[in-house]
């Protein structure tokens, strides 16, 4: 044998290597081994299913439901030995089995019996072609490709030359055309992998009737007309006829063809709940998907995991079943928000963008050691008093679209956290309303801007200022945070000490949260936001984390007063804003405009201007305990009297006739920003247009009464 004949050709670069080499000397590719096709039937089977279910057309990116195998490459046999010539080829996976085997070793398919019409040459190896004595090294030579073309068939889709024994293209999985009709179908077929079911049926019929030598002759039954193109390896060995498998495949194919982008995102979100992937849920929510959507029978069949998915399940059901507490906090809040919402920022996008530019222009960085960002304008958002002039039905519709009813109910009814004092809520017109906003980690920033300017932090302007302030003033905020965390732990009897490296790691994590859009924020970030606003922030929130069963999991630690303690008092405003906290979600708490009162609190020096709205925010809880002041230094910590004195220094405080210590929030429509006023008016006009229809109907009823 010549030197050229004993070498083996690399299937990638065609370099001829010595027989002792196990890898290609040039490209380091693995040497092909064996006399059968080197593509594992199990891999090829899963690859077929993966390609059929490939969601690339949905633009949803990678999916845990789809596992395509795009790494399949053609493998070439080096030679045909006499030993392999006696083997028979499986008609399903083309694996070469020993002559004595009655079933395929790989896929367990039944060996076909010898047909009377088959020639002796084809009976031993099924559909395996006669071996040609062609040097495998010379086969990759461009000059000799024409001589070996008889061993290959060219795919009509990707033009790859496949071995004669291959029933489907190794590269694109396109079926091999066997006659003129099938070739015409292949030419008119779309380039995508989605195959029309009628064309597939025609192709099967033509193959079963026009290729009697390649396949067994048609039986008395019509089994050959519904023969499968390929077999799912996981179903090989399962009890059931080929007709049932074919029907199952066609059903899955039809389901997949009906799937849209939102459907794939929903299935990925379901898998994300099971596997703990929050990103899949966020992707589904951001696409506008319905959180309360239920799994259908077809979707459960496509997921193919009965132990996890069942018909009628929603994302909430799956989160409960797999105990995803963090996801439940988001999903339960989102389910209640399926009603159409219409807040002022949504009505006029042009005005909203102008307000965002105004906020960005009013952000400045203070010069000096404490280089924190701050806002130059004092703006407080309130609901317009004109709402009370609308008919009751229109008012109800307005509140449904602008308020978060679930948050309002939890803070008012389930726990007396806000509006627990009839004196404040009724007589002093200081009832607080929870505005609806986005969920996830941006809710704190959204609620802060809603309580001031009435818009979202859509462009992350406030988040960027938060991150830059934390980064540039890291030493100042780090000292306050470290002292406060140490004191808070000791107040609960937890006496421990951490190394400085551990403190630094925790602080680095807090810094990283501020820079990531959508990341949840903590108490430290509220403290920094109070400095950016240059005004106090009062948080009214639930005291305990609870599971969906109502079990207490721990303290929330958010409720309390956050003062801009690192600024000079003369540089800050004393009018606070109020936020609500429930189930990992922040909401802006705003009041409704009133006409102002002269002397409603003991020791209060109120502005008598009728245009000024004064809202009384309690500084005690329903049990008359003083709210905690967060991030106090060791010198500022003291008893309740000392903390009350500190609150009076930073806030305009007074005591009501009922003995409730309150802080006064002052706002004025005339002094408010004109863009905010214009935005609110446009939003209110939307509901004023509903009024004439209701008024006309009432008038008609009155006329009918007069006639009677």
From Swiss-Prot:
Q: Which SMART domains match?
A: ZnF_RBZ
What InterPro entries does the record tag this protein with? AnkUBD, OTU_Deubiquitinase, OTU_dom, Znf_RanBP2, Znf_RanBP2_sf, ZRANB1_OTU
Answer yes or no on keyword Secreted.
no
Q: Which Pfam families match?
A: AnkUBD, OTU, Zn_ribbon_RanBP
Chain positions of ANK repeats: 260-290, 313-340
Effect noted on mutating residue 155 to A? Abolishes the binding to ubiquitin chains but not the deubiquitinating activity
What residues does the OTU domain cover? 432-592
Catalysis performed (reactions)? Thiol-dependent hydrolysis of ester, thioester, amide, peptide and isopeptide bonds formed by the C-terminal Gly of ubiquitin (a 76-residue protein attached to proteins as an intracellular targeting signal)
Which family does this protein fall into? Belongs to the peptidase C64 family.
Described function: Ubiquitin thioesterase, which specifically hydrolyzes 'Lys-29'-linked and 'Lys-33'-linked diubiquitin. Also cleaves 'Lys-63'-linked chains, but with 40-fold less efficiency compared to 'Lys-29'-linked ones. Positive regulator of the Wnt signaling pathway that deubiquitinates APC protein, a negative regulator of Wnt-mediated transcription. Acts as a regulator of autophagy by mediating deubiquitination of PIK3C3/VPS34, thereby promoting autophagosome maturation. Plays a role in the regulation of cell morphology and cytoskeletal organization.
The name this protein goes by in its record: Ubiquitin thioesterase ZRANB1
* Provenance organism: Homo sapiens (Human)
């Amino acid at each position: 044998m010549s030197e050229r004949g004993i070498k083996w050709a690399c299937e990638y670069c065609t370099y001829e290597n010595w027989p002792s080499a196990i890898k290609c000397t040039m490209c380091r590719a693995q040497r092909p081994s064996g006399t059968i096709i080197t593509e594992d039937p199990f891999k090829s089977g899963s690859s077929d299913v993966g390609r059929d279910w490939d969601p690339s057309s949905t633009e949803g990116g990678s999916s845990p439901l789809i596992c395509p195998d795009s790494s399949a490459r053609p493998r070439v046999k080096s030679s045909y030995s006499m030993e392999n010539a006696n083997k028979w080829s499986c008609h399903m996976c083309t694996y070469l089995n020993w002559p004595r085997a009655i079933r395929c070793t790989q896929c367990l398919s039944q060996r076909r019996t010898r047909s009377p019409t088959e020639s002796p040459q084809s009976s031993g190896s099924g559909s395996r072609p006669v071996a040609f004595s062609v040097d495998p090294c010379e086969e990759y030579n461009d000059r000799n490709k024409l001589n070996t073309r008889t061993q290959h068939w060219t795919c009509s889709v990707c033009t790859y030359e496949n071995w004669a024994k291959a029933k489907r293209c190794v590269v694109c999985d396109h079926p091999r055309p066997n006659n003129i009709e099938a070739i015409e179908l292949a030419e008119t077929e779309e380039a995508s992998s989605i195959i029309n079911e009628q064309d597939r049926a025609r192709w099967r019929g033509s193959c079963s009737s026009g290729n009697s030598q390649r396949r067994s002759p048609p039986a008395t039954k019509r089994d050959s007309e519904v023969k499968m193109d390929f077999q799912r390896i996981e179903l090989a060995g399962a009890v059931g006829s080929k007709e049932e498998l074919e029907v199952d495949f066609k059903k899955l194919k039809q389901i997949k063809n009906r799937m849209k982008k939102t459907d794939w995102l929903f299935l990925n979100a379901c898998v994300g709940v099971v596997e703990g992937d929050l990103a899949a849920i966020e992707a589904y929510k951001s696409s506008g998907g319905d959180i309360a959507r239920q799994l259908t029978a077809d979707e459960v069949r496509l997921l193919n995991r009965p132990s996890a998915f069942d018909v009628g399940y929603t994302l909430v059901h799956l989160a409960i079943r797999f105990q995803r507490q963090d996801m439940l906090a988001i999903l339960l809040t989102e389910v209640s928000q399926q009603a159409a919402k219409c807040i002022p920022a949504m009505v006029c996008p042009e005005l909203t963008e102008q307000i965002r530019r105004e906020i960005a222009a009013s952000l400045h960085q203070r010069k000096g050691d404490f280089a924190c960002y701050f806002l130059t304008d004092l703006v407080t958002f309130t609901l317009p008093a004109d709402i009370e002039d609308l008919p009751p039905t229109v008012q109800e519709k307005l509140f449904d679209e602008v308020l978060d009813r679930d948050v309002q109910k939890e803070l008012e009814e389930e726990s007396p956290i806000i509006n627990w004092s009839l004196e404040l809520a009724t007589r002093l017109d200081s009832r607080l309303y929870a505005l609806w906003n986005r969920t996830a980690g941006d809710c704190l920033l959204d609620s802060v801007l809603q309580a001031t300017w009435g818009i979202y932090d859509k462009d992350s302007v406030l988040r960027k200022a938060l991150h830059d302030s934390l980064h540039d003033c890291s030493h100042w905020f780090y000292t306050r945070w470290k002292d406060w965390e140490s004191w808070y732990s000791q107040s609960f009897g937890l006496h421990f000490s951490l190394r400085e490296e551990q403190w630094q790691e925790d602080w680095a994590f807090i810094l990283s949260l501020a820079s990531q859009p959508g990341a949840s924020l903590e108490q430290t970030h509220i403290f920094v936001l109070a400095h950016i606003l240059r005004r106090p922030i009062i948080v009214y929130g639930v005291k305990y984390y609870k599971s969906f069963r109502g079990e207490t999991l721990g303290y929330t630690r958010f409720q309390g007063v956050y003062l801009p303690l690192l600024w000079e008092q003369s540089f800050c405003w004393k009018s606070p804003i109020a936020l609500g906290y429930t189930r990992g979600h922040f909401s802006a708490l705003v009041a409704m405009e009133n006409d102002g009162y002269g002397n409603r609190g003991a020791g209060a020096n109120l502005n008598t201007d009728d245009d000024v709205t004064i809202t009384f925010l309690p500084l005690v809880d329903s049990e008359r305990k003083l709210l905690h002041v967060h991030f106090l230094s060791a010198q500022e910590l003291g008893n309740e009297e000392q903390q009350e004195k500190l609150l009076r220094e930073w806030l305009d405080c007074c005591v009501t006739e009922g003995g409730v210590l309150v802080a006064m929030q002052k706002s004025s429509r005339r002094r408010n920003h004109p863009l905010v006023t214009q935005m609110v008016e446009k939003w209110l006009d939307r509901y004023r247009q509903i009024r004439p229809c209701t008024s006309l109907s009432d008038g008609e009823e009155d006329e009918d009464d007069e006639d009677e």
